[in-house]
A protein has these predicted regions:
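Catalytic cores of carbohydrate-active enzymes across secretory and cytosolic contexts
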Residues: 1-337
């Protein structure tokens, strides 16, 4: 927080993030006023003025489409495609990261098959998982719990209903995205989740996004471009998967997937960068301000030490304890200990 207020502009992923940021500033810093106009928050402190705005990051649609249809990507996906063997696909593409809520996603899939056993031979759950922070004990335990749960589900239903593909291979993941019926993004919290945008752009099967309402991408996809879920609600997640697979008409799926693709393509990563560069040139300043606020250089180099060179409006924030284990980690540890 101390470093962020030293900037002239602070870019965040979503409007909700901007609201949280400005609220935090008002809680931690004295004599702060915040006003908003046209999506731009202007923050005044004792010493200076700066701005905050949402810049939702985009993708490079043309590039991801080229990769998805490349021969290299198809070769990388061929073995997984063979195991799928014509079944409907629920897909997730994520790092092995507790906030991604992978365990609950698997539990929702297990519940789906428990409640609708006719789907056992007709649907598979393809996991494209990238190992992450393997040197951290909690992450290793989380990865182990995923592996155990995958095995448990496959043993339970007597089929390879979950296909667990490990490794960082963008081409393989994008090739899989071309075929999904459902792409599941049930993160506990996520700044954006670009994989959802990539999936929307490359999918050729009228696939539908099922997205956590706490993922940044949902703020762009919530109005008719996806199905929203509460990430901790396993039953709602299972119901949403079933809705796409068996209740939505082909026309409904086509309409939703087309809208998602249009949204994901409409604001690219190039636009995202250009918007920030444009705003940094002063165009962001609202029209009701008589003249642009000049960039202000303030002594923030020593912001993290006890120097008195800090602006008076910037005070040291209290140290906090590390956050507790997030709920999905607790669920996964119970599985790992079984």
């Amino acid at each position: 927080m101390q470093s962020m207020v030293c900037n002239d502009f602070v870019g965040l992923q979503t409007a909700v993030d901007v609201d949280h940021f400005t609220s935090s500033i008002q809680n931690f810093l004295p004599d702060v006023s915040v006003r908003e106009r046209r999506g731009i928050a202007t923050i005044d402190t004792n010493d200076r003025q700066f701005h905050a705005k949402a810049y939702p990051i985009g993708i490079h649609p043309q590039r991801v489409q080229e990769i998805a249809i490349s021969n290299k990507a198809q070769r990388a996906y061929a073995q997984t495609q063979k195991i799928v063997n014509g079944r409907q696909i629920i897909l997730r593409v994520d790092r092995v990261e507790p906030t991604k809520n992978i365990v609950r996603g698997l539990l929702a899939f297990e519940l789906l098959l428990d409640q609708h056993p006719e789907l056992v031979k007709e649907v598979c759950f393809v996991l494209m998982l990238v190992p992450s922070r393997e040197g951290v004990t909690r992450y290793r335990r989380y990865a182990t719990s995923i592996t155990k749960l995958v095995q448990k589900i496959n043993d339970k239903f007597g089929e390879k209903v979950v296909i667990n593909v490990q490794g960082n291979n963008q081409g393989r993941a994008l090739a899989a995205m071309r075929e999904y019926d459902v792409m599941l993004v049930n993160s506990i919290i996520d700044g954006m989740h670009l994989g959802a945008k990539e999936g929307a752009v490359v999918n050729e099967n009228d696939g539908v996004l099922v997205i956590s309402r706490t993922a940044g991408v949902y703020q762009e996809m919530e109005n008719g471009a996806s199905l929203g879920i509460v990430p901790t609600d396993i039953q709602e997640t299972a119901d949403s998967l079933y809705k796409v697979l068996r209740e939505m008409t082909p026309q409904e799926r086509h309409k939703m997937s087309t809208k998602a693709a249009r949204i994901a393509s409409s604001h690219t990563v190039i636009d995202w960068l250009a918007d920030q560069l444009k705003d940094l040139q002063g165009i962001i300043i609202p029209e009701d301000i008589d003249e642009p606020v000049a960039a202000t250089i303030i002594p923030c180099a020593n912001i993290n030490n006890d120097s008195d060179n800090r602006p008076s409006s910037v005070r040291r924030l209290p140290r906090t304890e590390p956050p507790p284990l997030i709920p999905d980690m607790l669920v996964s540890e119970q599985i790992a200990n079984q």
